[in-house]
Swiss-Prot record:
Organism this protein belongs to: Geobacillus stearothermophilus
Protein known as: N-acetyl-gamma-glutamyl-phosphate reductase
UniProt keyword list: Amino-acid biosynthesis, Arginine biosynthesis, Cytoplasm, NADP, Oxidoreductase
PROSITE patterns for this protein: ARGC (PS01224)
Chief location category: cytoplasm
A GO cellular-component term linked to this record: cytoplasm
PANTHER family recorded: N-ACETYL-GAMMA-GLUTAMYL-PHOSPHATE REDUCTASE, CHLOROPLASTIC-RELATED (PTHR32338:SF10), N-ACETYL-GAMMA-GLUTAMYL-PHOSPHATE REDUCTASE, CHLOROPLASTIC-RELATED-RELATED (PTHR32338)
GO biological process, alphabetically ordered: L-arginine biosynthetic process
Catalytic residues identified in the record: C149
CDD domains, A to Z: AGPR_1_C, AGPR_1_N
Listed SMART domains: Semialdhyde_dh
Gene this protein is translated from: argC
Enzyme nomenclature, EC number: 1.2.1.38
Length: 345
């Protein structure tokens, strides 16, 4: 049985992590830490937690954190980059849900995140935890960088096409939409009910920090992939991401062969579900779960492939995938503690 800690448990992803780890079959203790609160029970921020044991927030201290088998960072940019290296040096396994270790080039991180990157030695050491496509590296990881929510949906949707070289490398367009929880829990005008309700709006046009993360992964699979066109929209719902992906095929593809390719690619991946030809997923189909559902189409007229990829941004896009990676790092079945079906309706 493992003892684990969560830093940043007062945010949405941190609270979801606590929910998953509190009921995990191999976790005996899950403690919570905060950079701003000490001695306060987590239920003060999240009443749904109730008066459970071990949910009192502790002050961040390296020596206190070093006693855990694994530490999860569910923190804003900059926190894990400062604290994680010392834990890694002490042999603690770190799973980071922020973007601090996703980009291998510190200069690229500084450009897109507007702050100094973590030490380069740790950027190189970090394993990118897109579980379905990096299992062996994840199993041996000490410092695990959990993918972002948009990159998870996008990369799972694109991987088979890019790896098989079936699409033109300069033709990728991603139109992504997210629920409001993706913006975090901190109050702001942009996520105020009156601003979001009955409204759809685009944001961070050509400037979203997940763009270089997606391109880095795509170019790892195929170095010829050109910069992508990527847009993000805020939708008046709590959870969910839908990434609608378009790419020009190099040659005509049978729609049935396309579906077969994806089914073969994700055979043995318990959390990726491929729809039958002509069927497309909705965000409600994965709500509250660690699943990624994918639907596919090919248009002979335009020679374009369309991929529809949906996830729950707080689960497969954050806490769920983090636990999936944690499971592999500890030598367990990747589905431990994650087998619940989506919540419906």
């Amino acid at each position: 049985m493992m003892n684990v800690a969560i830093i940043g448990a007062t945010g949405y992803s941190g609270a979801e992590l606590f929910r998953l780890l509190y009921g995990h079959p191999h976790v005996s203790q899950c403690d919570v830490f905060s950079s701003s609160q000490d001695g306060i029970h987590l239920s003060e921020s999240f009443p749904h937690v109730g008066a459970v044991d071990g949910a009192v927030l502790h002050k961040l201290e390296i020596e206190a954190l070093a006693k855990y088998d694994a530490v999860f960072f569910a923190t804003p940019p900059g926190v894990s980059g400062e604290w994680a290296p010392a834990l890694v040096d002490r042999g603690v396994k770190v799973i980071d849900l922020s973007g601090d270790f996703r980009l291998k080039d510190g200069a690229v991180y500084a450009q897109w995140y507007g702050r100094e990157a973590a030490p380069s030695a740790y950027l190189e050491r970090a394993v990118y935890g897109l579980t379905e496509w990096n299992r062996e590296a994840v199993r041996g990881a000490v410092l695990l960088s959990n993918p972002g929510c948009y990159p998870t949906a996008t990369l799972l949707g694109l991987a088979p096409l890019v790896k098989e070289g079936l699409i033109k490398e300069d033709s990728i367009i991603v139109d992504a939409k997210s629920g409001v929880s993706g913006a975090g829990r901190k109050a702001g005008l942009g996520t105020h009910f009156s601003e979001v309700n009955e409204n759809v709006k685009i944001y961070k046009v050509n400037a979203h920090q997940h763009i270089p993360e997606i391109e880095q992964a795509l170019q790892t699979w195929n170095e010829a992939v050109a910069p992508i066109t990527f847009s993000t929209h805020l939708i008046p719902m709590t959870r969910g991401i839908m990434a609608t992906i378009y790419a020009k095929a190099k040659q005509s593809i049978s729609p049935n062969d396309l579906v077969d390719l994806y089914k073969t690619s994700y055979e043995g991946s318990p959390f990726v579900r491929i729809r039958q030809l002509g069927q497309f997923p909705a965000t409600k189909d994965v709500y509250g779960s660690n699943y990624c559902d994918i639907g596919l189409a090919y248009d002979e007229r335009t020679e374009r492939v369309t991929v529809v990829s949906v996830i729950d941004n707080l689960m497969k896009g954050a806490a769920g995938q983090a636990v999936q990676n944690f499971n592999l790092m500890m030598g367990w079945d990747e589905a431990e503690g994650l087998r619940s079906l989506p919540i419906y309706p």
